[in-house]
Amino acid sequence: MNLVLENVNLNSNSGPNSFGQKLFKYMPSLGVSFNNNPEPDAYLCFIESGRPTYNAPLYQRLDGIYFNSEFDYKTQNSNIKRTYELAKGVIFQSQFNKELTFNYFGPHNNYTIIHNGADLNLINSIQNVIIGKYENVWSCASSWRPHKRLSENIRYFLEHSGKNDGLIIAGDVQDKIQHERIHYVGNLGIDKLFSLYKASKYFIHLAWLDHCPNVVVDAMACGCEIICSSAGGTKEIAGSNATIVQEDDWDFSPIKLYEPPPLNFANKTRNKWHVNDDYDMDSVSKKYYNFIKDDLDG
């Protein structure tokens, strides 16, 4: 199969692009070639496309849409929706993502849900960093926008950790909360990030209304126990032993995303929403291949 990856920057480590790198690495073993052949078998577009028409079937990988009422979300969504309507098939990252999109764009008649995957071959080749100073290492990593709730991550750590535990925070943080057991390491390359995860017992991701964060899949694959919010799709891939902080259900109405409500940590439970243990990228890439190939052959 000759497949064109569209709207993917293989030199970027952002969430969608890092997943594109994994597909680019794993799908050739299935007989997939990626090039700019003018007559491909299919296009796989990440999120949205700038093309008005296609000379082969288009499949859309949709990792989220806009719903922040403080912005013109309808305009932000317009080209994503156009791509959605052009697509022969749609791949959603999570059940939450599918329900959100159906609510805003209407149902699609050909779709599947494939959760994100981790590069286990790479993870298994990396040694964990030795952090002997602490009995238990906690970690978190993100692009720290307001809805990622860094301050709540820190509050959870301070209220639930032992006195000999430490929290390592990766990513660019503007307003640092200073504490002797909290350490900021900035943006890390993927090898160092995985090394940190492998040294960590817990990974905190209390982001509000996240879809299917790659950092959580990677941290879980590295052996971390996940702590996350019930709001959004993260709970679907956080593992059966994850701790879930329950929030009010959301009716999909536009909201002020960057003003997340405070969390009540008393409302926490084990993960009863977990639906996926198959996060090996080898298996995930086969799901992508089979969805597209079966549809083309059908």
What are these regions (language model features)?
Residues 42-70:
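Active-site proximal beta-strand in glycosyltransferases
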Residues 129-148, 154-159, 167:
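Conserved donor-binding/catalytic core segment of Leloir-type glycosyltransferases
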Residues 171-194:
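Nucleotide-activated donor-binding/catalytic signature segment of Leloir-type glycosyltransferases, i.e.
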Residues 208:
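Aromatic "clamp/platform" in nucleotide-sugar-dependent glycosyltransferases that forms part
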